[in-house]
């Protein structure tokens, strides 16, 4: 895993994914100075999370997609777009929750907490069920975090029953789609197997 994280990018796609990570690091300073420490912390958490696709050896296209989605999600929060454009929250939850659930699934498989779906009789169904469950769990944790933030950190954070249900439904749908596409997300030499020092770069 560490070798996969530290190796030089191979090709334009991997370089693009690394450029997005560098952009996230710059965003920590920009958000912290321009919108306050909480915004800077949010960007720092996102920047850390953006290392996961590289660490897991996922294909660069997935790495890029994850980076773009989480950066859009966090900057939408920093800029207050969720408050001015209420519907924007739903597609962002769909994409973000789906990709995060898929990454969590891959991590749990790599650490042998979960069985690799390819070893089971119905791999697509198994991956879809588990990833959807993980996505719903992540959605609940996010709603708890929003409630905590609204109650103790910033009352401008929007919370509400309809908002929470909508977020959970759309996030669960995104996780279901990610689970159904798990074979694409993990179609690389290092995604679900333990990375090796001489592993080839992940395909596009």
Predicted segments — roles?
Residues 52-55, 107-119, 183-194:
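Cytoplasmic membrane-interface segments at the C-terminal ends of transmembrane helices
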Residues 2-104:
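"…centered on the first transmembrane helix and the immediately adjacent amphipathic helix/loop
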Residues 97-114, 151-157, 172-186:
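Membrane-interfacial alpha-helical segments at the cytosolic side of multi-pass membrane proteins
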Residues 166-204:
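Primarily interfacial, aromatic-capped hydrophobic alpha-helices that serve as membrane anchors
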